Design a protein with these regions (language model features):
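Short Pro-Cys-Gly-centered "Cys-loop" motif that presents a nucleophilic cysteine in a tight turn
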Residues: 1-53, 67-187
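Short beta-strand->loop micro-motif that forms the acidic, two-metal-ion catalytic signature
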Residues: 59-67
């Protein structure tokens, strides 16, 4: 049975998740995390895209990503193929690196963008036991860029969009994006 074709909207962000096969680790050390960013940089040179939140865990990654020029599937094929080749070559790994095709969910509104980005940034403190006590202490997440108001050398990372979303919906949320992320959800 053929796979269902994914919907692509060049104007919307998508929450993308990719997990290691059998939930195995696909990022084993700092060099692997760095290699993933080199892959993103390579993909950006081919196809322009924007990431407003990310979290790279040891066995999966989350991206809040928009691909305005090409269908998301084409972009993700480049990213996942390049990283898979890197990993297989480095570790002499055979077989499928990833569990299945990437998960992607269209994020239709600004409120949804805030909610999804919060979920992404809370990943390191939501594990049992938590990987870190504070979100800003996890080095492989975009949260520290928001917390410390720092810039990045990666042109595909954009931290202004979520701040603008929060400003436009500020009657519902705390005054800063980081406060919004740090508030314990009552669900």
């Amino acid at each position: 049975m053929p796979r269902k074709k994914r919907l692509w909207s060049p104007h919307h962000y998508n929450h993308v998740v990719m997990r290691g096969n059998n939930r195995q680790s696909i990022f084993l050390n700092v060099a692997d995390y760095d290699a993933f960013f080199r892959v993103l940089q390579y993909a950006y040179q081919k196809y322009t895209f924007s990431i407003i939140a990310y979290c790279i865990m040891s066995n999966h990654y989350h991206l809040l990503i928009r691909s305005p020029e090409v269908p998301l599937g084409k972009l993700m094929a480049v990213i996942n193929w390049r990283y898979s080749n890197y990993f297989k070559k480095k570790y002499q790994y055979c077989g499928h690196l990833y569990e299945s095709r990437y998960f992607a969910d269209l994020v239709p509104s600004q409120l949804d963008m805030l909610s999804v980005s919060r979920y992404i940034h809370r990943n390191p403190i939501s594990t049992a036991p938590p990987i870190v006590e504070n979100m800003e202490d996890y080095p492989y997440s975009s949260y520290h860029l928001y917390k410390h108001n720092t810039s990045t050398d990666y042109p595909f990372l954009n931290t202004s969009i979520l701040k603008n979303c929060l400003l436009q919906t500020s009657q519902f949320y705390p005054p800063s994006y980081c406060q919004y992320c740090e508030v314990q959800q009552n669900k």
